[in-house]
Swiss-Prot record:
Disruption phenotype: No effect on cell growth, membrane protein insertion, protein secretion, or ribosome levels. PANTHER family: SIGNAL RECOGNITION PARTICLE 19 KD PROTEIN, SIGNAL RECOGNITION PARTICLE 19 KDA PROTEIN. HAMAP family: SRP19 (MF_00305). It comes from the Archaea. Involved in targeting and insertion of nascent membrane proteins into the cytoplasmic membrane. Binds directly to 7S RNA and mediates binding of the 54 kDa subunit of the SRP. Belongs to the SRP19 family. GO terms for cellular component: signal recognition particle. Part of the signal recognition particle protein translocation system, which is composed of SRP and FtsY. Archaeal SRP consists of a 7S RNA molecule of 300 nucleotides and two protein subunits: SRP54 and SRP19. It comes from Haloferax volcanii (strain ATCC 29605 / DSM 3757 / JCM 8879 / NBRC 14742 / NCIMB 2012 / VKM B-1768 / DS2) (Halobacterium volcanii). This is Signal recognition particle 19 kDa protein. GO terms for molecular function: 7S RNA binding. Its main location: cytoplasm. NCBIfam families: Sig_rec_Srp19_Halo.
């Protein structure tokens, strides 16, 4: 079983690539939450587990993270890109 981790910083439009953003600026959203990310992960078709007490190593504030379970058929980058697209759709 492959378990991928998605931090809100991966999708945050206010961060640069060197600060941790992993998607294109056009796909990023402003201040994504773990709840939005978890909902998007479920929309993509994977199981999501929210861990609110975790923080990304490049950030000082604790924003949590989302564990993506049973993602054996996709790479981490594919999952992050799909989740970013869905978070953008959820915001509209």
């Amino acid at each position: 079983m492959v378990e991928n981790v998605i931090y809100p910083a991966y999708l945050d439009a206010s961060l640069s690539r060197s600060e941790g953003r992993r998607v294109a600026q056009s796909a990023a959203v402003e201040a994504p939450t773990v709840d939005e990310i978890a909902k998007a992960v479920q929309q993509v078709g994977y199981d999501a587990v929210i861990e609110r007490d975790k923080r990304y190593s490049r950030e000082f504030e604790t924003r949590g993270r989302v564990l993506v379970n049973n993602a054996d058929d996709a790479t981490k980058n594919d999952i992050v890109q799909a989740v970013a697209a869905y978070v953008g759709i959820l915001r509209d």
